[in-house]
Amino acid sequence: NLNIIAYNNLSVTHTGNVVETVVRSFQIPTTEINTNSVIEILAQFGSSGGAFTKTLRVYFNTSNTLVGATLIGTQQSSATQFYGGFRRQIVNKNSINTNRIIPSAAVQVTDITNLTVNMANLNWNFSGTTWLIATIQLGNAAASATLENIQVKLSKP
């Protein structure tokens, strides 16, 4: 049973400063998430100018702010031109608030390609309010990067 529970395909580009900047945020409807659900976050992120570092970060929080937010995953590139997919799976382990994930510090494009680290405890409580917050940070103000879309899928037994 697979459902898209949150989705936004409005492209948003960040340029002009090196400050981590929120480019997308929305509340995830958590009423369908159960004790053995798999929550999958997918996004497309890219850039077409400058060999500077561009970083996409995805967070969860109980409110629409970065203050106190939990980092879910990071994608980073210094290529002059790139376009890639971001993917993280969160696996609930017989509980709504005991879950596992590839460590958030892993900078690989997706958790499929990341074979060199162990799973980590996330322990996010999906019984409460959950905001997904996506940010872009540039290594140089002359760079630019675009979040093309982001979605949350839910798979449950």
Q: What is each of the regions a protein language model found here?
A:
Residues L2-P157:
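Surface-exposed molecular-recognition determinants
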